[in-house]
Amino acid sequence: MKRLVLISLVLAAGCSTVPPTNVHQPMTARPSPRFEMANGNGSIYQAASSRPLFEDRRARFVGDTITVKITESTTASTKSNNKVDQSNAQKYGLGASTGMFGRVLPGAMDMSASSSTAFSGKGEAANNNIFTGNMTVTVIDVMPNGNLLVSGEKQVAIGSEQEFVRISGVVNPSFVDAFNVVDSSKIADARIEYKSSGQVSDGQVMGWLARFFLNVMPF
């Protein structure tokens, strides 16, 4: 009985999988190494833990957070029209034939051939995507030139459905406004994902047996 329950739990866990991701890892800041506390010097100012008094609170260190304003809109279209029409006609002859073969089949030495090819094809495709929203990400690395590598994930569970929003990329601190917000169009190497996991998303995917027959069918 225990073995049956264990197998059932393993199968249930396999049915609820997290969609794979291509964003920069890790999804949050790495744990910082622990340093020994510096000895106090008896003064209010401590050089080991000081930050400028009039410094703004924009993200610039590992572990800081930045709010990303997602305003993605892409439109693409393509159209093609191909037409091919080709014809060919040939005729060969040796004139009057002599001998018995020529008397029996007087036109046997005259040959003609013709061919005609016609092809017409049209294709048109259009794609329009809009993705808007806000999400806060974490600085996971600071590059030598000061740019920030950010990454973050948001999970929302509604009933049996789970939605995953993931963002990562490189942010120039000069593009971050006074409210610590940056537009997604200002993120370099941006990787923005919106995926879901659950019964609804599974119903939109063709089953493995149907995919197998679709691949082996010659027509």
From Swiss-Prot:
Keywords: Bacterial flagellum, Cell outer membrane, Lipoprotein, Membrane, Palmitate, Signal. Residues 1-14 form the signal peptide. It is found in: Cell outer membrane; Bacterial flagellum basal body. It comes from the Bacteria. PROSITE patterns: PROKAR_LIPOPROTEIN (PS51257). A lipid is attached at C15 (S-diacylglycerol cysteine). Coiled coil: none annotated. The keyword Secreted does not apply. A lipid is attached at C15 (N-palmitoyl cysteine). GO terms for cellular component: bacterial-type flagellum basal body, distal rod, L ring; cell outer membrane. One of its GO terms (molecular function) is cytoskeletal motor activity. The keyword Cytoplasm does not apply. It is a lipid-anchor. One of its GO terms (biological process) is bacterial-type flagellum-dependent cell motility. InterPro entries: Flag_Lring. The basal body constitutes a major portion of the flagellar organelle and consists of four rings (L,P,S, and M) mounted on a central rod. Assembles around the rod to form the L-ring and probably protects the motor/basal body from shearing forces during rotation. Belongs to the FlgH family. This is Flagellar L-ring protein. It comes from Dechloromonas aromatica (strain RCB). The lineage of its organism: Bacteria, Pseudomonadati, Pseudomonadota, Betaproteobacteria, Rhodocyclales.
